[in-house]
UniProtKB/Swiss-Prot annotation:
PANTHER family per record: DOF ZINC FINGER PROTEIN DOF1.4-RELATED, DOF ZINC FINGER PROTEIN MNB1A
Region Disordered: start-end pairs: 1-48, 85-155
Protein name, per record: Dof zinc finger protein MNB1A
Any one of the GO CC terms: nucleus
Effect listed in the UniProt record for changing C49S: Abolishes DNA binding
Main location: nucleus
Biased composition range(s): Basic residues: 119-130
Domain of life, per lineage: Eukaryota
Naturally occurring in which organism (per UniProt): Zea mays
Family matches, as InterPro entries: Dof, Znf_Dof
């Protein structure tokens, strides 16, 4: 016994202790009471596909974390299957199940969409002739309104005539050398006063200033002031 241990120690690396084979038949990596795992399949040999019987399959995962329902994928027909489950002909990336009625409804929907896309033709616009209504008969005029309008018009005419007469009179008076016949024709009676028209248009320089010997004191005396000098009025206040 000692010889075997010494031989093992001699064959071992220096500085390492010899391994003890006390639990030679026990796998310490697996807890006690669990069955040993199934041996891994050889490389290139997977579970046969239930559809195409191909061995080119691979394990994906356990369904619902249940080791009794492993899920596999077949690379030949690109289908999944689960052990103990039902087979479905649904390819990878495939859509949902279609009902026969859905195809007809989809075709009708496409036809309706195409109809909406087509431009709608505008109906031809009909030209309509618009006939003007016949003019209604004028209503009878109100006699009160007619009388008021006539009176107002006559008053305006009278005032306009009076203004024109006054303008013509001023024209005759301001024109020098107007013949007396025109005044007689208008009935103004200016022929008796031949100098009436000339008196208005006398020369502006014809005004005669009072003489230098004119006594201003007489005027101020009549007004109640005795001093003939107007400058002293404000100096001799009572």
């Amino acid at each position: 016994m000692q010889e075997a241990s010494s031989a093992a120690a001699a064959g071992a690396e220096p500085g390492r202790r010899a391994a003890q084979h006390q639990f030679a038949g026990v796998d310490l990596r697996r807890p006690k009471g669990y069955a040993a795992p199934a041996p891994a399949p050889a490389v290139g040999e997977g579970d046969p596909c239930p559809r195409c019987a191909s061995r080119d399959t691979k394990f994906c995962y356990y369904n619902n974390y249940n080791t009794s329902q492993p899920r596999h994928f077949c690379k030949g027909c690109r289908r999944y299957w689960t052990k103990g489950g039902t087979l479905r002909n649904v390819p990878v990336g495939g859509g949902t199940r279609k009902k026969p009625s859905s195809s007809s409804s989809s075709s009708s929907y496409v036809a309706a969409a195409d109809a909406d896309r087509q431009p709608k033709k505008k109906p031809a616009s009909k030209k309509r002739r618009v006939v003007a209504p016949a003019p209604e008969l004028a209503t009878a005029a109100d006699p009160g309104k007619t009388a008021t309008t006539t009176t107002t018009t006559s008053e305006i005419t009278t005032e306009t005539g009076a203004l024109e007469d006054s303008d013509s009179l001023a024209h005759l008076l301001l024109q020098p050398g107007t013949e007396d016949a025109e005044a007689v024709a208008l009935g103004l009676g200016l022929s008796d006063f031949p100098s009436a028209g000339k008196a208005v248009l006398d020369d502006e320089d014809s005004f005669v200033w009072p003489a230098a010997s004119f006594d201003m004191g007489a005027c101020w005396a009549g007004a109640g002031f005795a001093d003939p000098d107007p400058a002293c009025i404000f100096l001799n206040l009572p």
